Amino acid sequence: MTTAGIRAAVTGAVISAGIALSPMLLTACGGTGITGSGTAATQTRHLDAFSGVDLAASCNVTIQVGGRPSVVVRADDNLLRHVKTQARAGTLTIWTTGSFTTNSPMSVQISTPSLQALSLSGSGAITAGNIQAQRLTVTLSGSGVVRASGTVTHLDVSLGGSGEAQLGQLAARDVHAILKGSGRIVTRATDTLQASVPGSGTIIYSGHPAHVTTRITGSGTVTRQ
């Protein structure tokens, strides 16, 4: 093969590799993409009503229950467009696009009249306060943290991964908790607790429930606080 042929082959290989990697780069959050400007900005999003929040991004989300629906995004001014929010079928979904590095804290502040479901995947954080609901469902996968306070009748919480569900400030009559990973669930039940631990994590409960049922099939534990 001639020198020109070798150069063409190498160039083609590099281009092909770049094409193969591009979807991975586009979906990454952090790395060698866009760098945040360092100038913090806020943007208010006007969305349909919702009672569930699904976070699939590495950012901090604060939810205040009560009042009209409101979503305010805070980030570097050149990164706001990379924070996506969509309300559909009663659930607000938050995610990011592109590869970027932040220089200002990225967060989303939410107000909603009611809250019935929280879902977090990845390494983000959700803090929800003043919850008043008949039933609340909390689903967590990954290494993130969910914190909630208020009062509910029924609480269903499922955790897979190494994250934490800090729900000790959420007074619940009946709690059904499943811990599939190495994380930790802290909860409070006043009547009934059903705790299942097929993983290696820990469920810690308070509230002196009259009826406690535990099922441990892994190396995890269920402990009274």
Residue map of PLM features:
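Short acidic/polar N-terminal linker immediately downstream of export determinants
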Residues: 2-80, 91-111, 220-225
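Extended, compositionally simple hydrophobic/Ser/Thr-rich segments
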Residues: 43-44, 51-63, 100-225
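Acidic/Gly/His-enriched mid-domain segments of enzyme catalytic cores or analogous surface patches
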Residues: 88
